[in-house]
């Protein structure tokens, strides 16, 4: 009976977890921000000088043939010479669909959807202000390619203002990397001092996340400051209030499942992280850097970095010690991080993510074996006490208080913990939840094949074979546990339906997670047989 109740407890905890994470995604209140960091849209101008996406961009300049194209081993980028905005970015090494040659496009600007990275110079003498429009840069050519044997590729753009000041904007691309350096060089050849301020922002059409209860994912903004290591800023929150947070260093990003774009200004600079939603339905998040005063005859360099690529924790950590937090494992991150490390460790040896998941399942089950043994031992003792418990029920009848006292005395006398069977399950659930988020968030599993019909561990089984096998394994586990005659009929019914309910739930789960659960069930069945054999020798059945 105790074992049956434990299986029922697993089911209830599992369903509760799904409902809780859906509530977190939809209804959970965001942290209360200080008055200085968030202000109402109606009463603030987040950055009066920061231009809108298309301000000052002639229609003719948006034609594909006028864009500057850049090709590296990792990125296929298009830059609009008006302003020098990145208006297109395809990830060459990451395909849109498995087995197809079409690369995954992260940034683009189409008739119905905008997702671009904008940067420029604002301030008193800025060349990209909302009032003056955008600077029309000139380039030596319109096509740049990272050649074989070349580690970096520079794309210089030049603009000469009416006062004779030369502004050079250089994009520096790196082999094997998804980050781009954006460097401004300002040569003040005028007779007057200049005052400029760099900004960078990401603009995206507000679009709902392709999320579900089974695979909750986040699409929206996020930022980091010296006081807030990592915080999501949902589109609906951006529509209600503007972010305006002074900080040293920091970063601003747009997130979606597996991929991220982010502005990372220098960590030693004084910046302001800001956000807004424009009238055209564009969500904006970015940074404004320090104000620079440039004396006549002086030259000033201002730099920042932009990342556009997968949520690769190693690459992100190299840019900022908090940018890797965009791989969000939730409240059990402290448990998920070592699990992810172990998963990567196994994969580096076996070269197959499915086999790595099996190995980590065996590891987890092996580490939890003492708890599992204690669980079944406690359940066996409880079963042996059933005749005595039944005798207490008959003796005390409806007097629940006396019967409860007698039961506690019996447990104490027989050295049985009535919660002994539940505690190991409660300890195992956090591990399952942490692994769930690791498999959901780790971009390494995107398009990662296993074997046979499983070609992508990050999506559901196309033929539902793994979920059906998982349900069958639950049915076997259930049948190995006899139903006690004293068990409530309603509980019996719920237990009989539990494998079916779990199978239905797991139909839409990533096949990597179903594989973990299936292998875990098989190992549990084997462990159960081994433990029961030992208990029978001790007279516990």
UniProtKB/Swiss-Prot annotation:
Subcellular location: Cell inner membrane
Keyword Ribosomal protein on entry: no
Membrane topology value: Multi-pass membrane protein
GO cellular component: plasma membrane
CDD domains: 5TM_YidC_Alb3, EcYidC-like_peri
InterPro entries linked: Membr_insert_YidC, Membr_insert_YidC_N, YidC/ALB3/OXA1/COX18, YidC/Oxa/ALB_C, YidC_ALB_C, YidC_periplasmic_sf
Keywords on record: Cell inner membrane, Cell membrane, Chaperone, Membrane, Protein transport, Transmembrane, Transmembrane helix, Transport
Transmembrane domains' residue ranges: 6-26, 349-369, 420-440, 457-477, 500-520
Function: Required for the insertion and/or proper folding and/or complex formation of integral membrane proteins into the membrane. Involved in integration of membrane proteins that insert both dependently and independently of the Sec translocase complex, as well as at least some lipoproteins. Aids folding of multispanning membrane proteins.
Family: Belongs to the OXA1/ALB3/YidC family. Type 1 subfamily.
Protein name as annotated: Membrane protein insertase YidC
Organism lineage string: Bacteria, Pseudomonadati, Pseudomonadota, Gammaproteobacteria, Alteromonadales
Gene encoding the protein: yidC
